[in-house]
C-alpha cells in the first residue's frame, strides 16, 4: 500500500510539474493577462501576443522573443531570460535587412531608422535613398562589417538583420555583447509569397502602427486574390537570368517567384528544378538543359535584379544568340523585371496581379506595369 501511495504521489507531482510547464508556455508571460493574438493569414515565421497595458510579445521562429513596452508603461517583473525588452518609441534602428525597408516606408516610419546596412545608391526605395542623401539615415556598414562605434554612438536600441547574419554569427554576438539586441527578419523563408508581405504586421506591432499595417497588407491580399480569381491562362513562364559565366540561373520550384507565377494563373517552366538542397533559392542550369526546358515556354521573364536591366530585345539576345530560338522570343512575349523588384516586399500582391496581366495580354499589347516591362 505504501508503494502504491508513493507511486500515486509521484505521478501527481509529475502531473503538477508538467501541467505548470504547459500553462506557462501557453501564456507566454507568467502573471500577465493575455488579451489576444495578432491574426495572421500566411506568415508562419513569427507571432505577436497581446497583453494588458499594451504589452506585445513578438516571437520569431528561431529568432528570439521581444517584449514591446509602450512609452510610459512599466516593465513587468519576472520576464523570462530569453525575452528582450524593447521600449517604444524606437529610434535609430540599424536596418541591415534590405527587404524590410519598404515596410517601414509603407508605414510612414522611416523616422525610426537611423542607420542603414545599405548605401544610398543601393536603395530602390526612393524615400530611403533620399533620407540617406539628406543625412537623416546614416550608412553604418553592411551586415557582416558594421560600424560598431557609429552604432553605439547613435544609441541604437535594435539591429534588424536578415537571415544572412547566420553567416556572420560573430557579428551578431558582438552586437549583443555591446548591448544592441538583434532581431532577425526571416520573411524570405516564408513559404507563401504574401507571407513575406505580412511581416509588415510585425513591424506595425514594433512601432505601434498595427492599423496601418493591416490596411496595407489587406490591399496586397486583395490584389493577389483578384489575380487568383481571374483568368487562368495556363501559360508556361521561364524566369531566369544569364550569369557572367554563361549559365542560366533559375529559381527552384517552390520558391516564392515560382509560387507567384502559379498564383497569377501561369505555370513555372522549371517545375522539376529542385537543385541539390541548401538555402539558396537559385540553381545554375547548363544552357543545353535550359534550352530544352525553356524552348517552348509561352512567356520569358528576364530577371534583371542582380546583373542589371536589359532595356531592349537586342540586348537580351546579345546574352546568348540561341535565345532567339525560344518560342516566346519569336512570339514577342519577352519581359524583364525592374531592378527594384526584390526590395519591394510590400508590393508582392501587385507583382502577382501584374504577372496575371502579362499572362493574359496579347502580343500587340504593352500594359504599363510597375515591376515588369516588355522587351522590344
Enumerate the language-model features and the residues they cover.
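Bacterial Sec-exported substrate-binding components of ABC uptake systems
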Residues: 20-101, 212-239, 363-376
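Positively charged n-region of N-terminal signal peptides that target proteins for export
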Residues: 1-8
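Soluble non-cytosolic domains of exported or imported proteins
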Residues: 87, 141-146, 162-169, 190-197, ...
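Bacterial N-terminal signal peptides
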Residues: 8-16
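A short, structured surface patch at a secondary-structure boundary
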Residues: 60, 66-152, 158-165
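Structured C-terminal subdomain patch of bacterial secreted/periplasmic proteins
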Residues: 187-218, 299-376
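Extracytoplasmic ligand-binding site segments that recognize negatively charged/polar headgroups
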Residues: 91, 98-104, 116-127, 167-170, ...
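Flexible, glycine-rich surface segments
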Residues: 229-311
